[in-house]
Amino acid sequence: MANPSKRIINKKSKQASISSILNFFFFYIMEYFVAVDNETSLGVFTSMEQCEETMKQYPGLHYVVFKYMCPADAENTDVVYLIPSLTLHTPMFVDHCPNRTKQARHVLKKINLVFEEESIENWKVSVNTVFPHVHNRLTAPKLSIDEANEAVEKFLIQAGRLMSL
């Protein structure tokens, strides 16, 4: 006869598995509609503090946070651009997953709205990958700033090619 406590543990682990699968689909769908259908990010911010406040409102999501210094701005103000992870899970996401090119185009389109007067080549870009919450799903590498900058350069070149298709 099976041990009753073992049965309870098995039942709990099945419930946990089902719960994590449901969470995955909930966040996947939510990110899809936020990031792709509406062609939007969660916001454009002038400080990391504003950015962090917004991230606290969405504790279940991963983000890629782009920080731009716009050369057209006389005061060279830093602008922080917050993008949900499904759109761009890491700066190299589009290289790993070619069917994400549609999302990459949307991201570039949105960024172009912010920096209409500047071409991609003229942007000064730095990037931080931010993980406010850990899921058992896609795991992005934690990049150093140098690695991230290099990855972003490659991404922008790749995305620039996609935009011209």
Curated annotation (Swiss-Prot):
What's in the keyword line of the UniProt record?
Host membrane, Late protein, Membrane, Transmembrane, Transmembrane helix
The keyword Membrane is annotated on this UniProt entry: yes
* Membrane-traversing stretches: 16-36
Where is it mainly found? host cell
Tell me what topology the record assigns in the membrane.
Single-pass membrane protein
Q: Which conditions up-regulate this protein?
A: Expressed in the late phase of the viral replicative cycle.
Give a GO cellular-component term. membrane
Q: Indicate where this protein resides in the cell.
A: Host membrane
Q: Which family does it belong to?
A: Belongs to the asfivirus F165R family.
Put simply, this protein is called Uncharacterized protein F165R
Q: What is the lineage of its organism?
A: Viruses, Varidnaviria, Bamfordvirae, Nucleocytoviricota, Pokkesviricetes
